[in-house]
Amino acid sequence: MATLLRSKLTNVATSVSNKSQAKVSGMFARMGFQAATDEEAVGFAHCDDLDFEHRQGLQMDILKSEGEPCGDEGAEPPVEGDIHYQRGGAPLPPSGSKDQAVGAGGEFGGHDKPKITAWEAGWNVTNAIQGMFVLGLPYAILHGGYLGLFLIIFAAVVCCYTGKILIACLYEENEDGEVVRVRDSYVAIANACCAPRFPTLGGRVVNVAQIIELVMTCILYVVVSGNLMYNSFPGLPVSQKSWSIIATAVLLPCAFLKNLKAVSKFSLLCTLAHFVINILVIAYCLSRARDWAWEKVKFYIDVKKFPISIGIIVFSYTSQIFLPSLEGNMQQPSEFHCMMNWTHIAACVLKGLFALVAYLTWADETKEVITDNLPGSIRAVVNIFLVAKALLSYPLPFFAAVEVLEKSLFQEGSRAFFPACYGGDGRLKSWGLTLRCALVVFTLLMAIYVPHFALLMGLTGSLTGAGLCFLLPSLFHLRLLWRKLLWHQVFFDVAIFVIGGICSVSGFVHSLEGLIEAYRTNAED
């Protein structure tokens, strides 16, 4: 009797569990995620067995074909993606594809390139998140107060986490349970998430976001160059727009760049100069420590302008674009997490101290670019170094934007929208050079008509920065690794996606309002 009762209770519990699991699976399936049930697990195992046999057959065919002098001339070539296997549904690029060499030979290419150490990788990340845009952080504290300081810490934690989960999306387990790298770029991750229905949609979305962010970065360099020169020499009869035109004339040779060998020689010098400038600004602020206005640091926020501060802070931490290539070039990829921890901890401490000390020194008089608050004699010297750094930093995002445009629109073979920019001899065609010059001129026009450093940085950070750093990594992590995630990882990803979405929309709207208001003010003047 007891056995019969126990069996009935077991059957009831099993049926209830199966129903609840079916409901949860159905709900997540409608959302685009797949919850693995026992029957699905058997199906996946069966598919893996069939796939293993299929690839064994392919290997035998390859061995046979290697033993033959030549194949059938009338035979059709294999369809791209049939030989290469990828669990995400998107085929890997063929052995001769240019996608293999994007950025830095990942898992699928560039094995002959020298690998970098964790220290060198950390230096690259530091260059990305400790650049010139730190100069706008005191302006974020002006409108955010102590909450702005908290956001500098919070953004560092979240960006570090999303960088790690983005790299986790590059890896999957093979049949032997080994974790292997099956993707090599942000675009490949996005395509895998949208496969098989829309195998290229995700990559196009990421490419558009990358182009917007890179071009906006170029615009910001032109804006800050004109702003700094105008405030360094206010006595000269030269307007900020004229200084921007002069800066663009200096940058026009960037259109002729084929590689970054010439520019990379100056990267270390630029970074060292930037650290020296930060030290000079902090030293001046410390010399006025007696006059610090602690009472000006607010516990409340400016509701209209604080979302702009969020975009500024987020934009100063953006590095996710090149993390897949960077991790693929490391000698010890296992050290990537440790490298991310220390670089973001250092960035958080330095940014927080710089923003707080600078704001305490000038309080409500803090300007969009903090060096504009310095005395005339010091300001001219510091700003000249900053302009030099901005001009030498411009080619990096410009060249990256050109590469993304060329590979997405001009170098995809039969799928290209336009003919290739390069001739058969590797030389740049005249119309390709014209397009590059047009991109330089476009950055100038944007800098002339929207010469507001902080507002532009807030707009970019809210639009593409939040998308590439918060929204897409968390969404991709849920989509690709749903079956392996623990409940707290799912909670973190969903929370980051929701908070990032709210901050992105709010910051974008308020940044646009700020730009419209500033444009109207300039028109009235």
Curated annotation (Swiss-Prot):
Q: How does it sit in the membrane?
A: Multi-pass membrane protein
Stretches of the chain found on the membrane's Cytoplasmic side: 1-132, 226-265, 327-341, 405-438, 483-489
Q: Which GO terms describe its molecular function?
A: active monoatomic ion transmembrane transporter activity; gamma-aminobutyric acid transmembrane transporter activity; gamma-aminobutyric acid:proton antiporter activity; glycine transmembrane transporter activity; glycine:proton antiporter activity
What's a single GO BP term from this record? neurotransmitter transport
**Reaction(s) catalysed (UniProt annotation):** beta-alanine(out) + n H(+)(in) = beta-alanine(in) + n H(+)(out); 4-aminobutanoate(out) + n H(+)(in) = 4-aminobutanoate(in) + n H(+)(out); glycine(out) + n H(+)(in) = glycine(in) + n H(+)(out)
Presence of the UniProt keyword Amino-acid biosynthesis in the record: no
Q: Which residues carry this modification: 3'-nitrotyrosine?
A: Y186
Q: Where in the cell is it found?
A: Cytoplasmic vesicle, Secretory vesicle, Synaptic vesicle membrane; Presynapse
Chief subcellular location? membrane
Can you tell which superkingdom this protein's organism belongs to?
Answer: Eukaryota
**Gene Ontology cellular component terms for the protein in this record:** cell surface; cell tip; cone cell pedicle; dendrite; dendrite terminus; GABA-ergic synapse; inhibitory synapse; neuron projection
Q: Which residues lie on this side of the membrane: Lumenal, vesicle?
A: 154-204, 287-305, 363-383, 460-461, 511-525
Query: Which keywords accompany this UniProt record?
Result: Cell projection, Cytoplasmic vesicle, Membrane, Neurotransmitter transport, Nitration, Synapse, Transmembrane, Transmembrane helix, Transport
- InterPro entries linked: AA_transpt_TM
Keyword Secreted attributed: no
Q: Which residue spans traverse the membrane? A: 133-153, 205-225, 266-286, 306-326, 342-362, 384-404, 439-459, 462-482, 490-510
Q: In which tissues is it expressed?
A: Brain. Expressed at high levels within the neocortex, hippocampus, cerebellum, striatum, septal nuclei and the reticular nucleus of the thalamus. Also expressed in islets where it is more abundant in the peripheral/mantle region. Highly expressed in the nerve endings of GABA neurons in the brain and spinal cord but also in glycinergic nerve endings. Expressed in glycine-, GABA- or GABA- and glycine-containing boutons.
Summary of the function given for this chain in its UniProt record: Antiporter that exchanges vesicular protons for cytosolic 4-aminobutanoate or to a lesser extend glycine, thus allowing their secretion from nerve terminals. The transport is equally dependent on the chemical and electrical components of the proton gradient. May also transport beta-alanine. Acidification of GABAergic synaptic vesicles is a prerequisite for 4-aminobutanoate uptake.
Protein family (similarity comment): Belongs to the amino acid/polyamine transporter 2 family.
> What is the protein name for this chain?
Vesicular inhibitory amino acid transporter
Q: Give the classification, highest ranks.
A: Eukaryota, Metazoa, Chordata, Craniata, Vertebrata
